[in-house]
């Protein structure tokens, strides 16, 4: 027997399988300021105690495996293991629990969302002892946040670049999303920007397809926004989608956008991946480009209520990885509770500090120290009648994006943009005068439509679609 084997035997190593809770359930643990804290919604299999389920999550997402191993003795598990330190039942749900897990910071590579997620939302989500598992929230410690660049520029720098203050920004996704030639696509961009919007957007599906290669689209869109800028005297932007099949092609597109002198590019951060997104965000800061983020594929991850990951976690991850805008949903037409939840993660995107507030879905107090904020983008099924609600709900630091609500105007693209800009300016002026947008919203829009025929036509075409506060 070798000396090493004798040493291990003498300290009582015993092969076999033991309950996770014996090692990883530690209700007496006091969390550290440097710990990453996670709140998991755990649905154990029948017969599995919640303490064992919570401990299994902590183990399988940190140092644990299914059996005792010799090499446990070659490191300090107390230093590196995750710990399930608190469990509470979910009100109104049978056999569901919120399990709180603390992870030592040394488990994670600095500045890598990819590595953080590989551990925390990795193989543990397929663990047989659990019927379902959902990551509801994360507390990112300041010590870890400071290893990330974060958003390339942030809200204030973007406003300074665009010279636009005191109101939400207006955007429009060009439709149809697929099938237009580059020249016709550029024409639509020009008409909408000339009509008064601040931004137009590539649809997330638009990369470099046979009907419209990326370089042609970039050239025609750049020509369109420069022409619109010259006519309106305002700085304009088009979200040029740099998402590609390889990081090399993505960077090639970002470099060409910079050479054209446009102000902003775009990335699909979930389908493109966090490594690609962080790479692009670093390039954007170094080269003065704003970065618009689309969340295509998010519903695959966050739609189920008891499995996957809540979007607030994806939003926090984006703020670490880097982006100046991100789509956040519209809130319009949602139930009141859902509105509070949505505005909870909107505040997590924008604010420097957010207090714990379970009614808004915020499980942990979160400080972002000097990390710039991200503008939430409200888009999807909105039109001029929604403008008072959107202005009231999202405030100035947001992007309100009307696709069909611009391009569906009966008189064409430019009048559709005019209608949205007039509606927004009317709502902002009314708010600044102290009027209540929640109660007087429809009246404000009707008053503005009396001197704007474009807005009057938009009001008529969408009058049957109502928003209820």
Swiss-Prot record:
SUPFAM superfamilies: RuBisCo, C-terminal domain (SSF51649), RuBisCO, large subunit, small (N-terminal) domain (SSF54966). InterPro entries: RuBisCO, RuBisCo_large_chain_AS, RuBisCO_lsu_C, RuBisCO_lsu_C_sf, RuBisCO_lsu_fd_N, RuBisCO_lsu_N_sf, RuBisCO_lsuI. The modification N-acetylproline is found at residue 3. GO terms for molecular function: magnesium ion binding; monooxygenase activity; ribulose-bisphosphate carboxylase activity. GO terms for cellular component: chloroplast. Coiled coil: none annotated. It is found in: Plastid, Chloroplast. Substrate binds at residues 123, 173, 177, 295, 327, 379. The record marks 334 as: Transition state stabilizer. The keyword Disulfide bond applies. It is an enzyme of class 4 (lyase). CDD domains: RuBisCO_large_I. Keywords: Acetylation, Calvin cycle, Carbon dioxide fixation, Chloroplast, Disulfide bond, Lyase, Magnesium, Metal-binding, Methylation, Monooxygenase, Oxidoreductase, Photorespiration, Photosynthesis, Plastid. Its cofactor is Mg(2+). Heterohexadecamer of 8 large chains and 8 small chains; disulfide-linked. The disulfide link is formed within the large subunit homodimers. RuBisCO catalyzes two reactions: the carboxylation of D-ribulose 1,5-bisphosphate, the primary event in carbon dioxide fixation, as well as the oxidative fragmentation of the pentose substrate in the photorespiration process. Both reactions occur simultaneously and in competition at the same active site. Belongs to the RuBisCO large chain family. Type I subfamily. This is Ribulose bisphosphate carboxylase large chain. It comes from Atriplex patula (Common orache).
